[in-house]
Amino acid sequence: EVACASLVTILLMPRSGGAMYTTIKTYSKLAKVSVRGLSEEDTVIVSTLDYTTEDHTLFAPLWAGVPDESHAVHMIGRALSDASRFYRPYGVPACPSLTQPEAETVSQSVHLLWNLFVCEGLLRYGFRTDAAKLFAHNMTAVIQSLKLNRAFHARYHAERGTGIGERNALSGLAPVGLFLKILGVEILSPTRVKLEGENPFPWDVTIQFKGLKVIRGQKKTEVVFANGKSVTVEGGESAVVEV
């Protein structure tokens, strides 16, 4: 019986290896749980879902642009950048507050898709450097996995960077599109490129596409088109370069 506002009787049918029952309704609290028909050798385990645990989905509002600027800064500074909460050397883990060893492959998993959402949220609020830092953490895990195991993995360990789950899963591939967004480069066509902000990475980046070459430096960007024409853009102002 589950005692709350009403009583629900749990009937366990004996079988080899035990039995399991999940209540149909949800309850705000339990006054009593009783199971009848057990022998002295039987063991009963009662478990509930913990909705108070923080997980990476809490950053979805950043991606959707829901909070105002001050609230977003608060979320980024006090949660995303806090080592006691979500900040880890290889990315944002799924449920960092769960520290039990048996839950590690789930709680400490870095899901690249959810980290992508976080990065896009950072970009939305102007935190390009923070997005670049998080992306670099993710890529360190991806590169390490390729070097050690010659494979991508579905997820990566937030503390160690080791691969978790299925080998060569699509969800573990390096997000090239996200890299270009953080870099501030959008190739509209072989003759048209949109530039935004400055290169947040500590190295120059060269991109080649159908005869087009974009050399993204720290303070300037050179765009070389297939016909040989070259255009240099200084600073971090948004611009569309075309021929």
Q: Which residues are covered by each model-predicted region?
A:
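Active-site-adjacent structural elements in folded domains
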Residues: 44-48, 89-108, 160-163
